[in-house]
Each structure stands twice: as C-alpha cells, then as structure tokens.
C-alpha cells in the first residue's frame, strides 16, 4: 500500500533505533497586535508574543516511545514530555522533560498492566504534570490504550491540560485483538474517560494496521504503531509551526479540534504524475480511516511536499476531499514544506464527528444530547482527577 503506513513499516524494518525552533507562524486569537511602522526587532517581539506553545506528553510505554521517535525525527516547535511509571524504560527515552509518575505507589517498577495503578500514579504526580504543561496553548496526550500506565494516566494528564486552558488533543492506539479481552476492555474504559476530558480524541486502531503489518514480527508491528502516532502528532503540530504555501494558525486548528469529540486519521503519500489525487486517495483508503467520511462535521488537512510543490497541487488534494465530505462540513487545510521530500506528496486527513466500528464506547449516545448527558452526571463537581468517571471500571 502506497501510504505513510507503508513508510512506517519500512522505518521499523530498517532499524531498532531508528531542533526545535521557535514557531515561524502562530495565531493567538485574542491578542492585541501593535500597528504602525515598526522596526525588525519590534516585529520579532510581536512574533514571540504570538508564538503558540505546544507540548506533547507521552504517557506510558507507547506514549513515551512516540515522544522518543519525535525527538529522533525532529519536530518543529513543540516541547516533549515523557511520563511513565517504569524508570528503566524512562531512562532510555529522549525528551525535554521526563516525569517518573507515582514513585511512592510503584517505586519506579511500572503499573503491572493495571490502569487503576497508572491512574493513581498520575494523580500522585499531578504537580509535576501541571508544571510540565504550564503555559501551553495546545497539549497532545499520546498513549497506547489497554495497558496500565498509559490507559490510567492519559485521562489525568488530559484533564489537567484542559483545566489549565489548553486545547487538548489525545492521540491513542487501541490494542490488537491478539492482546486479549482484558486489554480491550481496559482500552474501552480508558477511551471513555478520555472522551470526557479531552477536546478531541484521535483513535488509531491497531487492528486496522494488521492489513499492513500482518507479516511483520510482533515487536516491529508495535514499532509501526508508535510510528503512526508520531507522524500524526507531528503532522498536526507542523501545520502551525512550519512555514508553507498555505499557513494555518492556532485559531484555525482550534476551530476544528475544540470539542471535536472522537476523530479518525488517514495518512497517505504518492510520487506519481497525479500525486495530488493519488495521495489523498491513499489517505482516504488508509486502513486507519475506517469510516464513512461523508457524515463528518469537520476535517483538518495537512499537505506536505518538497520545495517544488505548487499551490495547484495542494488545492487538488482539498478538492478531492470536498467531493467526498458533507458540503456543510468545515474543512481547514494547510501545507508544509519538507526539504527532504523530493517528488513525493503526503496527505494527512483528520475527520471529526464520526462513527466507526473500530471505536469503542458511546458512539450512538454521543450523537444525541439527551441520553449522553444523562449518563454522565458527575463532571460538574470535579472533585479530583479521575473521579468524574467512577461509573466505568477497569478490570484486572
């Protein structure tokens, strides 16, 4: 399959191990910008004030692996935080900030695949978590759902980020069927909790990756999953922080992602003569995007190409999407330039307000205001992180 998923497989097979700069363009929404004749230094000061502060928090093993891959790959304009209960794993991760969660609870030995322990560890370390995301305009929370630390801690981190006023986007994987029913049940509970506290939850179903990674060894299949998480976060972040033919700012991304609910992502690439059409078709046929996008209420599109990419090529990608999505849906798109890409074009499509058989939880209830609101009466008081969703239990 000619897609970024295939590219991720190539990365995983090649190696076991496989800087940030200030944002070039960012939007602050409500900031007052001085007008009139200004010097270059004064303009630089204004640009610094408008800079969007983005933080990526990797929770647990899979989330920390995502952060590590982003540090290796290089991400433009984001701070990287790795948060885990396993000190041995954390030592090997590259990140701007590392948080060993729940030292008293776990002694650095991990959560034992128990989400309850991961949640308690994150609550114990809420001070460090809040410090690591302080001042952020947008926070990505990445995790692999189904295990202990990522499943339990990701909702706590997302809740803290949203309470501090950040646009909060969770990007998570759901487990392979072969991982067992316990992990699937815990992933469902973790996803439900994330839906209550994050603005948007982008779900990457590992089962759908089997279409591409079925013949790979198990360890490399998980590396592909980590790679897809990394590329998803990087693609959204660099829409804001990297210059392109069509630039987006933070306000644009907030328009789609704020209260976006559950979202799915498609990744595609092409280097053919008709690469614009082929890359978007590859993204829409991606096994990760197992939805009927015609019912989506909004979409965020990132088109990445080399220095020779034309505005006509980028527009061709978006025109293809307009033909397939609800005419009333809001589509926000931008481009970024990657000097390392020659003739290729990459397309990332995030669609929100969708239903999919690959998504666990209350899809049906989420569509109607009545039942969904009645089933979650606790969020109003907000006594402490994690307690607003006590009705959904993890299993051991």
Curated annotation (Swiss-Prot):
Location relative to the cell: Cytoplasm
Disordered: annotated span = 1-38, 358-396
Q: Per the record's keyword annotation, is GTP-binding included, yes or no?
A: yes
Q: What is its main location?
A: cytoplasm
Quaternary arrangement and interactors, per the entry?
Homodimer. Polymerizes to form a dynamic ring structure in a strictly GTP-dependent manner. Interacts directly with several other division proteins. FtsZ1 and FtsZ2 could also form copolymers whose stoichiometry is balanced by CdrS regulation.
The record's function comment reads:
Essential cell division protein that forms a contractile ring structure (Z ring) at the future cell division site. The regulation of the ring assembly controls the timing and the location of cell division. One of the functions of the FtsZ ring is to recruit other cell division proteins to the septum to produce a new cell wall between the dividing cells. Binds GTP and shows GTPase activity. FtsZ1 rings form just prior to cell division events.
The name under which this protein is listed is Cell division protein FtsZ 1
Underlying gene: ftsZ1
């Amino acid at each position: 399959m000619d897609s970024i998923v295939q590219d991720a497989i190539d990365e995983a097979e090649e190696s076991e191990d496989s800087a940030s700069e200030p944002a070039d363009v960012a939007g602050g929404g409500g900031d007052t910008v001085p007008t009139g004749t200004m010097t270059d230094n004064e303009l630089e000061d204004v640009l610094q004030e408008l800079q969007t502060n983005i933080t990526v928090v990797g929770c647990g093993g899979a989330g920390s692996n995502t952060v590590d891959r982003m540090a290796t790959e290089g991400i433009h304009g984001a701070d990287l935080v790795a948060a885990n209960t396993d000190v041995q794993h954390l030592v090997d991760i590259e990140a701007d900030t590392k948080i060993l969660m729940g030292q008293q609870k776990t002694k650095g030995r991990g959560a034992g695949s128990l989400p309850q322990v991961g949640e308690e560890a994150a609550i114990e370390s809420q001070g460090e978590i809040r410090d690591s995301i302080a001042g952020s305009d947008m926070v990505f929370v990445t995790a692999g759902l189904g295990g202990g630390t990522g499943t339990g801690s990701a909702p706590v981190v997302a809740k803290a980020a949203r309470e501090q006023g950040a646009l909060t986007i969770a990007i998570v994987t759901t487990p392979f069927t072969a991982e067992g029913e316990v992990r699937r049940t815990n992933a469902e509970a973790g996803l439900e909790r994330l839906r209550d506290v994050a603005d948007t939850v982008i779900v990457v179903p590992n089962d759908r990756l089997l279409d591409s990674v079925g013949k790979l060894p198990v360890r490399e299949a998980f590396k592909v999953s980590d790679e897809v998480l990394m590329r998803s976060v990087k693609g959204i972040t660099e829409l804001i922080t990297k210059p392109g033919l069509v630039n987006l700012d933070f306000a644009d991304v907030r328009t789609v992602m704020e209260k976006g609910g559950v979202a799915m992502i498609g990744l595609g690439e092409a280097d053919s003569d008709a690469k614009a059409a082929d890359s978007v078709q590859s993204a829409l046929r991606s096994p990760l995007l197992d939805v009927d996008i015609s019912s989506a209420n909004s979409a965020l599109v990132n088109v990445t190409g080399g220095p020779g990419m034309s505005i006509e090529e980028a527009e061709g990608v978006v025109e293809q999407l307009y033909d397939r999505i609800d005419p009333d849906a809001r589509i926000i798109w931008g481009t970024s330039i990657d000097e390392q890409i020659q003739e290729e074009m990459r397309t990332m499509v995030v669609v929100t307000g969708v239903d999919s058989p690959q998504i666990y939880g209350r899809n049906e209830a989420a569509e109607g205001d009545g039942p969904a609101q009645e089933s979650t009466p606790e969020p109003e008081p907000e006594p402490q992180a994690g307690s607003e969703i006590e009705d959904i239990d993890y299993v051991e």
